[in-house]
A protein has these predicted regions:
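Acidic, small-polar-rich N-terminal luminal/periplasmic segments of exported/outer-membrane proteins
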Residues: 31-170, 527
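Outer-membrane beta-barrel translocator/receptor signature
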Residues: 136-139, 150-225, 231-236, 286, ...
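Acidic/polar loop-and-plug regions of large Gram-negative outer-membrane beta-barrel proteins
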Residues: 207-211, 224-295, 310-357, 401-423, ...
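Membrane-embedded beta-barrel scaffold of Gram-negative outer-membrane proteins
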Residues: 293-295, 301-307, 311-319, 492-496, ...
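Conserved C-terminal beta-signal and adjacent last beta-strands/turns
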Residues: 355, 379, 494, 614-721
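Structural signature of Gram-negative outer-membrane beta-barrels, strongest in the C-terminal barrel
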Residues: 357, 374-388, 425-548, 572, ...
């Protein structure tokens, strides 16, 4: 019934080492994570030479034995991406996983929802995912798909999202934007090297958004500063800081009618449960990172980094949930945690102010390259410390009335007179780890071997601050990979990685409410091929299998009717295809497809086996192309297609959201006014105004349905001053 995510218990350490690429010359300078080159989809720029973040270290895209995708600044600008859900629509391996409008959003990679405590990173360091992640200060977004045990330690097995910040440069840009709803957007990007050894980059954005959902308009202010300081001939210090404040009413998700039927005749502009007294959800976030590097020689480098991330959420919502108080559910024949068969739903006055999440991290690392006979080594080793805390006040979560999904106007009810209680520590987690990885090169082969030893100490507390759980675990997480350079254009690889994540919490409607299940070990095997047919195009294919113990609410004879258990295995087997770069001098393409089979077996509940798991479509595809018109210099036509197969919405697989295709289109025009470049972007998402369910994800054990946005046009213009 709680509309919020439960306090995230997965608390992992920083990204692991990114070792030197052994195939590079011995005197090649090492690049820092914040200097990773994005895969640019434009002519004359080799797409395959970009180093990228991955669990197996830094190297060119072709030599990385993992599925990694980079969404660069050019693509983010062309698609006018502003939210995490919009970001996910650009990669077929990603999908929404409880992503309401007006609230912080979460996504899934390869069918596994990310942990909001450890799955999102800025410049390689974990940040609190319980924030509205801004993109104005981001140069590229790196998507590591699959297990990242060495890179992140204790975490969900789907992967990680790494936001790479902009570095100081000579730039002065102003962007103005609006959309078909009347939103107003302004952003500035200013950079300058104040001296040959010290540079700054300042980004800011102010947004007043008019949402397509009634009564859900919002605002956002964002500020960031990045500095680079070259210390002597061998040292460098990079510091990044950003702050954002936002306020917007959160839109509740729909639920199945009577637990068996999708809602029909849904108006996407309707705000479920709207009450005039409902305040917006306020989210204030601060993120700080610092990295110091020192080159002992051309082959050895030390790296010391630290980060701090804080998110404060004032959670206020008239929350639409279940039908416990509705007449259609009074006899108990319909589960109370779903909407009633006729569309009735209960409204709760939910308030949880000062919900505070903090991440603090420190890491020391040594990277080096050396030879032993005919074998070249690129070694990385180090240690890190990660701490995470969650402080929350006792919330108000009171029933105030019942409405129906087809009400033209939601009935108004009086709010609860209760007030939130005092703040108390809910989670205190610490993770200490040591790691090492060696990339050994011999002829056309590379063997990567390493691991991470992690020790976790975590305490959870109830609403009053009374201890209720103390978890301790120590695990070694090995990983290895073999890369074969078949030709100058083709590399093939096979990899094996082990990971660990903490157990889930039993939902309130199960017989063991609030119980945390044991930590789960996961295993992943992946085989891939990467093909670089030219200097500006990359093609990739990856076949993977990831498995972990299955944790779920099992039907039984208890008074609650369900008990949350760990039984059987959950296995995700899939094929991913990617293409990125220039098909011709005028045509660029970013495309991906995912074919995923996610099943449970030996779970002890036959109805829950033999079919796709919830919120994991079997097939996803996304295509975005841009064609430069030959008869108008600087004018490009953009087009996109997004597809998802039917999406299971119940544990027994009997109800699914239908498959959908969505088409996007746009224009991009670059010209100059005097000596100043100007770029216009016009994009139309969901061109044919298709209705579809974009998300059947869960929060606190309950499942929700979120409709996709209707047709929306966006216009922006960027002036280089």
């Amino acid at each position: 019934m709680n509309r919020c995510f439960r306090p995230t218990l997965l608390s992992a350490a920083l990204c692991a080492a990114l070792p030197l690429h052994a195939n590079e010359p011995a005197d090649a300078p090492e690049r820092s994570p914040t200097e990773l080159a994005a895969v640019r989809v434009q002519a004359h720029q080799p797409a395959a030479t970009a180093t990228q973040t991955s669990s197996f270290g830094a190297g060119d895209w072709k030599s990385t034995p993992a599925s990694v995708n980079v969404l660069d600044r050019d693509l983010l600008d062309s698609r006018q991406v502003r939210t995490l859900s919009e970001l996910a629509s650009n990669d077929a391996s990603l999908g929404d996983s409880y992503a309401p409008v007006g609230y912080y959003q979460n996504i899934a990679i390869r069918g596994f929802p990310l942990d909001t405590g450890t799955g999102y990173r800025f410049n390689g360091l974990a940040i609190s995912g319980e924030q509205r992640l801004a993109l104005e200060n981001i140069q590229s977004v790196e998507i590591l798909k699959g297990e990242a045990g060495l890179a992140a330690g204790v975490m969900a097995p789907g992967g990680i999202i790494n936001y790479v910040g902009k570095r100081p440069a000579e730039v002065r840009n102003v962007t103005l934007g609006t959309d078909s709803e009347g939103s107003r957007y302004t952003a500035v990007d200013l950079g300058h090297w104040l001296s040959p050894r010290f540079g700054v980059r300042f980004n800011a954005a102010w947004e007043d958004s008019d949402s397509y959902i009634d009564h859900a308009d919002g605002r956002r202010n964002f500020y960031s500063l990045a500095t680079d300081w070259l210390i002597g001939e061998r040292g460098k210090l990079e510091v990044d800081a950003n702050y954002q404040t936002s306020a917007q009413r959160s839109a509740s998700g729909y639920q199945l009618l009577g637990a068996t039927e999708l809602p029909r005749g849904v108006d996407r502009k309707h705000l479920l449960g709207y009450q005039a007294w409902q305040r917006p959800v306020g989210i204030d976030s601060t993120n700080l990172t610092a990295l110091h590097t020192y080159d002992f020689s051309t082959r050895w480098q030390s790296r010391v980094s630290a980060s701090y991330s804080r998110s404060v959420i004032d959670d206020n919502v008239a929350f639409a949930y279940g039908c416990y108080y509705a007449a259609g559910c009074a006899d108990g024949s319909v589960p109370g945690n779903y909407f009633a068969p006729n569309g009735d739903y209960d409204i709760y006055d939910y308030r949880s102010p000062d919900d505070t999440r903090r991440n603090l991290e420190f890491r020391g690392e040594l990277r080096g390259a050396f030879d032993t006979g005919a074998v070249s080594h690129a070694l990385s080793m180090g240690a890190d410390r990660f701490e995470r805390t969650v402080d929350k006040r006792r919330n108000v979560n009171e029933y105030v009335g019942t409405a129906n999904i087809h009400d033209p106007q939601v009935p108004q009810f009086a709010p609860s007179p209760l007030m939130p209680g005092a703040s108390a520590r809910r989670l205190d987690s610490a993770q200490t780890a040591v790691f090492a990885l060696d990339r050994m090169s011999f002829g056309d082969w590379q063997w990567l071997a390493g691991g991470r030893f992690v020790r976790l100490d975590e305490r959870a507390y109830d609403k009053r601050g009374t201890p209720e759980r103390h978890s301790r675990l120590s695990r070694f997480l090995p990983q290895t990979a073999l890369v074969w350079k078949a030709t100058d254009e083709v590399n093939a690889y096979v990899s094996y990685v082990r990971g660990i994540s903490l157990g889930q919490e039993a939902p309130f409607w199960t017989s063991n409410e609030g119980t945390f299940l044991p930590a789960v070990l996961s295993r992943q095997v992946e085989v891939g091929v990467k093909f670089v047919p030219g200097d500006a195009l990359t093609l990739g294919a990856a076949l993977f299998r990831t498995s972990q113990p299955f944790q779920y609410a099992k039907p039984d004879g208890s008074d609650a009717g369900y008990t949350f258990v760990e039984e059987g295995q959950q296995t995700h087997t899939g094929l991913e295809l990617t293409a990125q770069g220039q098909l011709s001098e005028r045509l660029s393409l970013t495309a991906s497809a995912s074919f995923l089979r996610a099943r449970a077996r030996d779970a002890g509940t036959p109805d829950y086996e033999g079919h796709q798991l919830i919120n994991v479509p079997k097939t996803r595809a996304t295509v975005h192309a841009e064609y430069q018109l030959p008869f108008v210099t600087g004018l490009g036509v953009t087009g996109g297609w997004r597809y998802a197969a039917s999406n299971v919405a119940t544990a027994d697989g009997r109800v699914s959201a239908p498959a959908y295709s969505v088409f996007d289109a746009g224009l991009r025009f670059k010209h100059q006014v005097g000596e100043h470049p100007v770029t216009w972007n016009l994009s139309v998402d969901n061109l044919f105004n298709r209705f579809y369910w974009r998300d059947t994800g869960s929060s606190s054990g309950d499942y929700y349905l979120f409709p996709g946005a209707p047709r929306q046009a966006r216009l922006s213009v960027t002036f280089a001053l």
